């Protein structure tokens, strides 16, 4: 969608090689965009008609090495695992409690790596989950039902809040 045209599997697979095995269409394009979230403490201000407020149970962050060559495992990101562990511990939830996931998929492989690192499936099983349709909207665990960055592009300043905004809207739809 962000490329402005429907693409066939052949067009995607035959597009320019960027970094083997990733082709042009395995990489999300930088785009323009914005996202905004208003955060308040409980009882402050008006809910502006929000009949189903959403509560943040946990927030965590971690940093890792920027150079992939410095990673001991190029199919895993320690920072993702660390932040996920902290957030799940703070929230009292486990990966099995989650029923929709929006994650950073700047490259086609990133969705699989991140989903595994977040604990949604065993290491090495993410590709199988995706090819079996288990991560589709109608699957066991919908991952990036918004289309992710490959569908909407990578609006750098809005990339972090975009999934938050999308999941907030989905939570309101479910509650209604």
Label for each model-derived stretch:
Residues 34, 76, 80, 107, ...:
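Catalytic-loop motifs flanking and including active-site residues across diverse enzymes
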């Amino acid at each position: 969608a962000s490329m402005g045209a429907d693409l066939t599997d052949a067009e995607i697979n035959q597009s320019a090689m960027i970094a083997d095995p990733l082709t042009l269409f395995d990489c999300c394009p930088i785009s323009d965009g914005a996202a905004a979230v208003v955060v308040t403490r409980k009882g402050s201000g008006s809910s502006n008609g929000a009949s189903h407020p959403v509560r943040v149970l946990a927030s965590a962050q971690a940093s890792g090495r920027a150079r992939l060559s410095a990673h001991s495992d190029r199919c895993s990101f320690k920072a993702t695992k660390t932040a996920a562990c902290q957030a799940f511990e703070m929230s009292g939830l486990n990966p099995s409690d989650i029923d929709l996931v929006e994650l950073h998929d700047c490259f086609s492989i990133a969705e699989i790596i991140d989903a595994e690192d977040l604990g949604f499936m065993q290491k090495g099983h993410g590709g199988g989950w995706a090819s079996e349709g288990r991560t589709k909207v109608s699957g066991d665990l919908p991952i990036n039902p918004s289309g992710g960055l490959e569908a909407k592009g990578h609006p750098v300043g809005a990339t972090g809040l975009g999934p938050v905004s999308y999941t907030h809207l989905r939570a309101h739809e479910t509650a209604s």
